Amino acid sequence: MQQKREGKTIMEIRKITGVVPADKRAVEAAFDSIEPQPVACCNWPEQYPYAPEVSFRMFHTGAYLMLRFDVAERWTMARVTEDNGEVWTDSCVEFFIAPDDSGYYYNFECTCIGRLLVGFRREREHATHATPRVMESILRNPSLGPRPFPEHKGDRK
C-alpha cells in the first residue's frame, strides 16, 4: 500500500469498482477487504500524552474516495454542530492528501459525529475552506450518529 519514491512516502489507494456509497453493505464489505493502517502519531505528546487507538482503511471507486477511521478512545466529545467549525475541539481525526506534486494539499478534519473542516492549502496558514455546496457533497456515516453530545468517559468506537 505504501512505497518510497524520491524520498517521499507514496500511498497507493486501491480501486474497487461496483461499490455505490448508498449501499452500506457493499461499502462495509469493501472496507473489510482492506488491511487497516495504523495511525501511530501523537502530535503534542508533552501536552497530551494520551493517544487513542486509531487506524484507517481507504479505497476509491473511480468516482468516490472512500475513507474509514476506526477509533477507540477513553473520552469522547462531540459539541461542534456545523461544518467548517472548530472541529479540533471535539474528538476528531485528520486526513491529508496531496493529489499531485504541486505542493498543495487537502486537509480534512472530521469529528466522531461527522462534522468536517476541509481546507485546501500549501502551508498550515492561509487555507481556502470548502464551500457549503462542496461540504454537502461529502457523504458521511458516523458510527456514533450525527447528534452532538457532551464528553463521555468509557470505551467508545
Which residue ranges define each predicted feature?
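Structural preference for beta-rich elements and adjacent junctions enriched in aromatics
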Residues: K4-K157
